[in-house]
Curated annotation (Swiss-Prot):
Presence of keyword Ribosomal protein: no
Organism this protein belongs to: Homo sapiens (Human)
Keywords of this entry: Acetylation, ATP-binding, Cytoplasm, Kinase, Nucleotide-binding, Serine/threonine-protein kinase, Transferase, Wnt signaling pathway
Disordered: annotated span: 309-337
Gene (name only): CSNK1A1L
EC number of this enzyme: 2.7.11.1
Sequence ranges of Basic and acidic residues compositional bias: 326-337
Protein name, entry field: Casein kinase I isoform alpha-like
Single GO MF descriptor: ATP binding
Record keyword Mitochondrion present: no
Subunit architecture: Interacts with FAM83A, FAM83B, FAM83C, FAM83D, FAM83E, FAM83F, FAM83G and FAM83H (via DUF1669).
Modification type N6-acetyllysine: residues: 8
Role played: Casein kinases are operationally defined by their preferential utilization of acidic proteins such as caseins as substrates. It can phosphorylate a large number of proteins. Participates in Wnt signaling.
GO biological process, one term: Wnt signaling pathway
């Protein structure tokens, strides 16, 4: 196996987590596949140079500590320093929803969108009950689990999360304006564009844009061109504000427009009615006569690919028997995410 992870491969962190290869990277640094030397368990290892201007891994590790035990929150194995790096060792998860969207040719059925929506709302609700906002809701930050957790959705990347109320007094942070936009501009709420301090309503509105991204395959404010990043953000903001919810959701069940209108109508400190939002989509799911069987679009594709691989493998064996020659076959055209 070729190794593209440079000098970090074979490094052991936390006394028992051996780095195998690089599997991703972000603004903070790199993510490696690691193996636990004591039991052979695979883990994900995030490395951040201690020289970075704005370190965020320590903060993120504190967030994971607070959130531990929640459904769909990855387990944190270890945090510490190793060879000039801050290191966070987590459960190894499966592909992100962005990966799976691409795998499914950027088309999700309504059944898949609704099954995902149910879990996504619950993940954000849990983070909010722990007094934090996520502030970077996007398909890349929702990952499916692996093995027996392959149908469970996990929420990751709490580097931009912010405490919105005090644990003891339950005092909410004050309303402010002139704030810089935090998060991913494509899914940012209108109030975030306007420079208003984010609160629970903004996470929920961002989620509504993710739903419509999956439904439509793209959002009307994608692909806008501008000379500078600032001008691009302004164009996106203008397009988002000038696109009525009914236009954004045209051609899709009314529940999606109801969801977005509800979120946009929330007051700064107001608690979203998470159960009402889940029920919107659960009732729609039943109305459309879907079965909640965790058969997602990618489940079907992978099953089909596995069947094709098995059948081509069988044909290969037949050909080998007939000709006495080994026939090299492509066993599977799907990456095991």
């Amino acid at each position: 196996m070729t190794n593209n992870s440079g000098s970090k491969a074979e490094l052991v962190v936390g006394g028992k987590y051996k780095l195998v290869r690089k599997i991703g990277s972000g603004s903070f640094g790199d993510v490696y596949l690691g193996i636990t030397t004591t039991n052979g368990e695979d883990v994900a290892v995030k490395l951040e140079s201690q020289k970075v201007k704005h370190p965020q891994l320590l903060y993120e590790s504190k967030l994971y500590t607070i959130l531990q035990g929640g459904v769909g929150i990855p387990h944190m194995h270890w945090y510490g320093q190793e060879k000039d790096n801050n290191v966070l060792v987590m459960d190894l998860l499966g592909p992100s929803l962005e990966d799976l969207f691409n795998f499914c040719s950027r088309r999700f059925t309504m059944k898949t969108v609704l099954m995902l929506a149910d879990q996504m709302i619950s993940r954000i609700e849990y983070v909010h009950t722990k007094n934090f906002l996520h502030r970077d809701i996007k398909p890349d930050n929702f990952l499916m689990g692996t093995g027996r957790h392959c149908n469970k959705l996990f929420l990751i990347d709490f580097g931009l999360a912010k405490k919105y109320r005090d644990n003891r007094t339950r005092q909410h942070i004050p309303y402010r304006e002139d704030k810089h936009l935090i998060g991913t501009v494509r899914y940012a709420s209108i109030n975030a564009h306007l420079g208003i301090e984010q609160s629970r309503r903004d996470d929920m509105e961002s989620l509504g844009y993710v739903f419509m991204y999956f439904n439509r395959t793209s959002l009307p404010w994608q692909g806008l061109r501008a000379m500078t990043k600032k001008q691009k953000y302004e164009k996106i903001s203008e397009k988002k504000m000038s696109t009525p919810v009914e236009v954004l959701c045209k051609g899709f069940p009314a529940e999606f427009a109801m969801y977005l209108n509800y979120c946009r109508g929330l007051r700064f400190e107001e608690v979203p009615d998470y159960m009402y939002l889940r029920q919107l989509f659960r009732i729609l799911f039943r109305t459309l006569n879907h079965q909640y069987d965790y058969t997602f679009d990618w489940t079907m594709l992978k099953q089909k690919a596995a069947q094709q691989a098995a059948s081509s493998s069988g044909q290969g064996q037949q050909a080998q028997t007939q000709t006495g020659k080994q026939t090299e076959k492509n066993k599977n055209n799907v990456k095991d995410n």
